[in-house]
């Protein structure tokens, strides 16, 4: 469907054939962001979970996400469980962003609706160590980098390894396989 739609959109400009770059169906995204959803039971106890908006802008709670990389899939539940055990890490947590790589380097940005202090820094450092990730805390006009705000990536392009550094907040192609194919297409054409 998409291929035919795009051919029609470009039909006034070209009749050339399109080279199609295909993606995997699952476990292909190395970048993802999720809202945090707070749920209270009848006794006032709360739980937190990851959430997204569906097509109608309704909240969709999720406990897993099959399109993210296996490493992100593995870290998601562990991270949420550990955060939920520490009030300082959990308090007013609004969203979580993941930026991963093929080297299993993973940067997690925790976004809050409150100012982050020294107590948060100490617990975030412990969380980094327990989960083996890099953490950044963000809130309005604040960015707390616990160890560093970048990750290492290694891509094999035309049978040669290239090393990259991806920085938090910068653009990265979230689909590593598509990224490699796009770069190879440019180099080969």
Predicted regions and their residues:
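Accessory RNA-recognition modules of RNA-modification enzymes
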Residues: 1-189
């Amino acid at each position: 469907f998409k291929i035919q739609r795009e051919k029609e959109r470009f039909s006034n400009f070209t009749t050339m054939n399109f080279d199609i770059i295909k993606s995997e169906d699952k476990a292909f995204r190395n970048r993802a962001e999720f809202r945090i959803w707070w749920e209270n039971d009848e006794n006032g106890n709360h739980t937190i979970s990851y959430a997204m908006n569906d097509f109608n802008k309704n909240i969709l709670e999720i406990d897993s996400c099959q399109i993210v990389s296996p490493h992100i899939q593995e870290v998601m539940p562990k991270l949420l469980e550990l955060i939920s055990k520490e009030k300082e890490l959990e308090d007013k947590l609004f969203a979580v962003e993941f930026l991963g790589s093929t080297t299993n380097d993973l940067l997690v940005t925790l976004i809050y609706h409150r100012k982050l202090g020294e107590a948060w820094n100490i617990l975030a450092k412990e969380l980094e160590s327990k989960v083996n990730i890099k953490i950044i805390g963000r809130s309005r006009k604040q960015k707390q980098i616990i160890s560093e705000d970048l990750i290492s990536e290694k891509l094999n392009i035309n049978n040669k390894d290239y090393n990259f550094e991806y920085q938090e907040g910068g653009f990265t192609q979230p689909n590593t396989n598509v990224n490699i194919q796009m770069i190879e297409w440019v180099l080969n054409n």
